[in-house]
């Protein structure tokens, strides 16, 4: 069995607003009891290269409702029936060109018609049927997808509430728009992330998030207590890359060797909302040959949190969070090596203070004037 962990104590990056992801505030409509106002959250994450094209990631949060039943006769004075909320839901519209007018985006949501169905293969799945989307998003990824199939636990808050024999519709309430550089849009193929080999060592990344919640809340029971008393701490892991095993028997492949590799990569971590809450990692230095497939040509990679921890990702739909710390961990890649070796931890992962919070750029995303009732 592995012995105790070897940790390299290094200073934590200075505190900054850029380490935070803010939750949407709850603003109720004055008319219509219990109705939330539609809102937009706007964020910019740029690579720093002026030649890099800008795009927008549009991510939506809302609620699944049963489709209203229609009667035989309908008059013009009939009011549209609003069915009760069944559960919360997230759906990404993907990447597309830069969008400008926030109020236009909110009004365009009335043109959305997305049906929801439950199915199963080896596990439960959700099928989104895209019947109609606003013309404003015609150049975004969702316009090319008539059907979107996904694991139910990643996109639906409480999939157990969806039952057979009921038609469901997805109603968008919150719109998260991230203006970013095109070079940031890179994810590692799942087969590469899942592959393990005795010929390499695996580099994992642990990000500690301070989640905004009350100590006596239900979600706090599944997290660690924050020693600073400012919320709860959640740990999420990603497979970052692989490093080739050194074969020089005269060299010590210890924490100093690993720290040197990480230091040369100059790793920086930030958080954004792209495919839902997403951790972004940038390698600004030398990337070893074995690690290059895990980054794009400009050293960026995105890791959606719902791929690693669906339950934590769903918590972040409605709760703010802050990056407390990030570490890289060197492990054996294959399970036999993993069980026999210690974890070597490198804690000097920078938090990008310009790309880890959600601030309004030139307008306030939380004004009521930029909101409409979620009809």
UniProtKB/Swiss-Prot annotation:
Pfam families for the chain: Matrix_Paramyxo_C, Matrix_Paramyxo_N
Superkingdom: Viruses
Main localization category: virion
Single GO molecular function: structural constituent of virion
Gene Ontology cellular-component annotations: viral envelope
Record has Lyase as a keyword: no
Compartments (UniProt record): Virion
This protein's record includes keyword DNA repair: no
Coiled-coil regions listed: none
Keywords of this entry: Viral envelope protein, Viral matrix protein, Virion
Assigned protein family: Belongs to the morbillivirus/respirovirus/rubulavirus M protein family.
Role summary: The M protein has a crucial role in virus assembly and interacts with the RNP complex as well as with the viral membrane.
Protein name per the record: Matrix protein
Organism: Mumps virus (strain SBL) (MuV)
Encoding gene per record: M
């Amino acid at each position: 069995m592995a012995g105790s962990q070897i940790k390299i104590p290094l200073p934590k990056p200075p505190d900054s607003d850029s380490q935070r992801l803010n939750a949407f505030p709850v603003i109720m409509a004055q008319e219509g009891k219990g109705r939330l106002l539609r809102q937009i959250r706007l964020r910019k994450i740029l690579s720093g290269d002026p030649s890099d094209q800008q795009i927008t990631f549009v991510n939506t949060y809302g609620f699944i409702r049963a489709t209203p039943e229609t009667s035989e006769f309908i008059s013009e004075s009939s009011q549209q029936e609003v069915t009760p909320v069944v559960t919360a839901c997230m759906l990404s519209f993907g990447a597309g060109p830069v969008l400008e007018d926030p109020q236009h985006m909110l009004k365009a949501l009335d043109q959305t018609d997305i049906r929801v169905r439950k199915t199963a293969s080896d596990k439960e799945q959700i099928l989104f049927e895209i019947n109609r989307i606003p013309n404003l998003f015609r150049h975004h990824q969702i316009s090319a997808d008539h059907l979107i199939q996904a694991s139910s636990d990643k996109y639906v808050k409480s999939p157990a509430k969806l039952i057979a024999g009921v038609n469901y519709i997805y109603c968008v309430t919150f719109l998260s728009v991230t203006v970013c550089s095109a070079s940031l849009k890179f994810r590692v193929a799942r087969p590469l992330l899942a592959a393990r080999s005795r010929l390499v060592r695996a580099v994992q990344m642990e990000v500690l998030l301070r989640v905004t919640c009350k100590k006596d809340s239900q979600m706090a029971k599944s997290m660690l207590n924050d020693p600073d008393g400012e919320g709860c701490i959640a740990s999420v892991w990603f497979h970052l890359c692989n490093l080739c095993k050194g074969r020089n028997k005269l060299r010590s492949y210890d924490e100093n060797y690993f720290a040197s590799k990480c230091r040369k990569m100059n790793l920086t971590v930030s958080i954004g909302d792209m495919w839902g809450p997403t951790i972004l990692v940038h390698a600004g230095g030398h990337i070893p040959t074995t690690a290059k497939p895990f980054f794009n040509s400009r050293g960026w990679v995105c890791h959606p949190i719902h791929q690693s921890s669906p339950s934590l990702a769903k918590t972040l739909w409605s709760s703010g969070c802050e990056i407390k710390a990030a570490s890289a961990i060197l492990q054996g890649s294959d399970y036999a090596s993993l069980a026999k070796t210690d974890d070597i931890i490198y804690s000097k992962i920078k938090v990008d203070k310009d790309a880890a919070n959600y601030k309004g750029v030139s307008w306030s995303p939380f004004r009521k004037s930029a909101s409409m009732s979620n009809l």
